[in-house]
Amino acid sequence: MELFYELLLTAAASLLVAFLLARLLASAATASDPRRRAPDHAAVIAEEEAVVVEEERIIEVDEVEVKSARARECVVSEGWVEVGRASSAEGKLECLPEEEEAPAKAARELVLDAVLEEREEEGQVGEERCDLAAAVAEVVGVKPHELGVEAAPGEVSDVTLEEGKVQDVGVEQHDLVAEAAPREALDTGLEKQGVPIIEAVEIKRQDDLGAEVAPSDVPEVEFEQQGVRIIEAIDVNQHHRVALAAPAEVVDAGLEERVQAIEAGSSGLTSETVPEEVLDELSEKQEEQVIEEKEHQLAAATAPVAIPGVALAETEELKEEQSSEKAVNVHEEVQSKDEAKCKLHLVDQQEGSASKVELVGRNTDNVEISHGSSSGDKMIAELTEEELTLQGVPADETQTDMEFGEWEGIERTEIEKRFGVAAAFASSDAGMAALSKLDSDVQLQLQGLLKVAIDGPCYDSTQPLTLRPSSRAKWAAWQKLGNMYPETAMERYMNLLSEAIPGWMGDNISGTKEHEAGDDAVGSVLTMTSNTINQHDSQGNEDNTGMYEGHLTSSPNPEKGQSSDIPAE
């Protein structure tokens, strides 16, 4: 393989060397041969300039030839053409503008210069003069067999074609009685204006060949020329002008009558415009009256609108007040329903104490309650019905509870009595201050136990909304206790309260032993506690005063996501 690669490299090197040698030999041969030398650039540029100069000279020669040709055409077009017509002649003479290389138009249009140029180029001008004369006679001449009256035939007297492109076409006619006046007027007008371009005469014939040509058929003059001056005039014999003065006067008279008719028409128009102005004024007055009436109607319509607007505002205010009153009434009804439900739950617990309070209230005006202290001293306190009412229990409700208790006759147990004392401490100011210093978990446990002890297990309680996290935390603590009995909840509540606040019994009252009549006071305290709890839970307040609020006034535990409120059932 290595040998093969070496051979390939050797071949490539030899090819490269051969190519370079060939290039060197070719360059040497070119340098030695003068014919193969590079061309001189200066010579090439000089040749190109010579070619450009030659082309410019040719263009100038062409322009000079074109200008000379146009000058010859102008000289040819300056010839005079004499046209004569009989009085009863009919037909139409039109001299149209000459255009470069424009063909001759058929029928009544003939461009003599174009025909002359074509004939001159072909070298047949002298041979076909008769044809040109015949063409002129066809356009201008009169054909007697087409007329209904005797008229002298039109004779083309002089048709001369000059080699210098000047033409004179003379047509002599003897009967110019009816046509001389318009021609004379036209001739005088052309002389006064001095217009370089004079239009040819156009005569309109009448259908009635026997009648004379109307004076109003004044010849129309039209000339169109682009860059060429064409002058054509009418040479009329002087001996016929005297006899033809009368038709000119007739024409003037006709024109004066038309002017008078036009003036009369304009005066009639001015007379007719007067009632239009009057009508405009009347219409403007009517519009002003209509506008005034509409303004009065609008003013009358807008005046009473203000009073209904005030009335509507008042009705809206009344509706708002009524809606707010309805909301307050609904809120009060909900509170009353919650209170009634709580009362039904605590009827069994309050009946015994309520009956005793009622009996004592009927028999004696004062209730003696003996409290034993640690030292053995006894204190006597008198609680009247007025003091019970001031504590938050209305007299009517107390009497109703007493009646239920008297009818049932159920006595309270020792646990219920002790729980009543604990609940009374929790609802006091000192108890609320002490509970607020506890941990949020302990507060939630106390809330759940208190709820089970008073309302029972959480069976069908509605879960609070997500927007109230404190209520949801209390409800969760209540539901976590499950189907716990109220007595068990009371006992656990007192034990947890003793662990959290060891001296709560001594701080609340001077002793923990109650008199027999002390059961009545405990029942009243439980009733007040139940009413206060249900009122606050129904309103949804999270930080109001009461038993639940006193238990949880500190900030919730952020780790467990709980707060310090349990919703009412």
Swiss-Prot record:
Please report a single Pfam family linked to this protein.
ACBP
Q: Does the keyword Endoplasmic reticulum apply?
A: yes
Q: What Gene Ontology cellular component terms go with this record? A: endoplasmic reticulum
Ligand binding (an acyl-CoA): K474, Y493
Per the UniProt annotation, where are the glycans attached?
A: N508
InterPro entries, alphabetized: Acyl-CoA-binding_protein, Acyl-CoA-binding_sf, FERM/acyl-CoA-bd_prot_sf
Signal peptide range equals 1-31
Name the keywords, alphabetized: Endoplasmic reticulum, Glycoprotein, Lipid-binding, Signal
Polar residues: compositionally biased ranges: 533-544, 552-569
| An example Gene Ontology molecular-function term | fatty-acyl-CoA binding
Instruction: State the compartments where it is located.
Output: Endoplasmic reticulum
Residues forming the ACB domain are 415-506
An example of a Gene Ontology BP annotation on this entry? fatty acid metabolic process
**Positions of region (Disordered):** 533-569
Q: Decide whether keyword Electron transport is in the record.
A: no
Inducing factors: Induced by salt stress and infection with the rice blast fungus Magnaporthe oryzae. Down-regulated by cold stress and wounding.
Tissue-level expression: Highly expressed in seeds and leaves. Expressed at low levels in roots.
Q: Which family does it belong to?
A: Belongs to the ACBP family.
What role does it play?
Binds medium- and long-chain acyl-CoA esters with high affinity. Can interact in vitro with palmitoyl-CoA and linolenoyl-CoA. Binds phosphatidic acid (PA) and phosphatidylcholine (PC) in vitro. May play a role in the biosynthesis of phospholipids.
Protein name (record):
Acyl-CoA-binding domain-containing protein 5
Q: Which organism is it from?
A: Oryza sativa subsp. japonica (Rice)
